[in-house]
Amino acid sequence: MSFFRNQLANVVEWEEFRDDMIFYKWNNREIKKGSRLIIRPGQDAVFLNNGRVEGVFQDDGDYDIESEIIPFLSTLKGFKFGFNSGMRAEVLFVNTKEFTVRWGTKQAINIPAAGMPGGMPIRANGTFNFKVQDYISLIDKIAGVKDQYFVEDIKTRIISILDQLLMKWITREGKDMFNLQANAFDIAKGIQEDLDMQLISDGMTVTGFQIMSFNYPQEVQDMITKNASYGMVGDVNRYQQISMTDGMASGKMSGSGAASDMAGMMMGMNMANQMMNQMNQNQQAQSSGPQSTGSGSKPNFCPNCGTKTGEANFCPNCGQKLV
């Protein structure tokens, strides 16, 4: 009975295919006479003999191993099946698709910033893409000792070094610490190159790295939003005028009744006219080109808190916009 069992042909295939599995090794010790190889779409089959690559087959289909595979192997191409003996070989099935993985910093990383001795705590998140590129390196470094390998294994490796790379490239490419998203493309490009160098020796390549967002502490985000409001209306006086107009429109200012409503409406109209006049004056001044006077120069001390200013366009102490 055991004699006939040894003669049963194998079906060499990756049956339990998973999208998150990078490769799977079929190693049932012997390939019997009459066995078939099944390659499904999105898979490559690599024949191995004693750890050496005998052949790589990339076209999906159903193949007779004796007549359609063995003739194309390297050292085993002359192999003949015996009456009661099979071919000792392993078959590595590789997932050929490009993998997309989400990433995010587990904890905030402190980026050096002016006026912040401990650095600016920042979180970030996004995605990266990778795929298998070199089967020889993959086998030498990973597949030689593992029967299967998952996307999660790669993600763990990437996350372990990502904080250092973010700090490196934010410091190098981040032109404005309060608006890092403006330089997200350059930061991501540098990180992708470094990650690719980490994985290329293992037979994989990083084909893309994207930063979806940078996240600041709430108090810093509030300061950024406040400064954006200042910049949008031009100066503090205009900001106060808009705030007062909004307060009257929402009914939050003191006073009630028809007289109060009428007074509020008249005041709002007057402020709106003043704001329009100021905006028109600014537009005319801008259209006339840059002036040689120092009215648009950066002050030596912050007008809001009095702190001495540096090279940045914002006060290092309170975040006040300086120019």
Curated annotation (Swiss-Prot):
Superkingdom of source: Bacteria
Matching InterPro entries: Band_7/SPFH_dom_sf, SPFH_YdjI
SUPFAM superfamilies: Band 7/SPFH domain
Protein name, per record: Uncharacterized protein YdjI
Organism of provenance: Bacillus subtilis (strain 168)
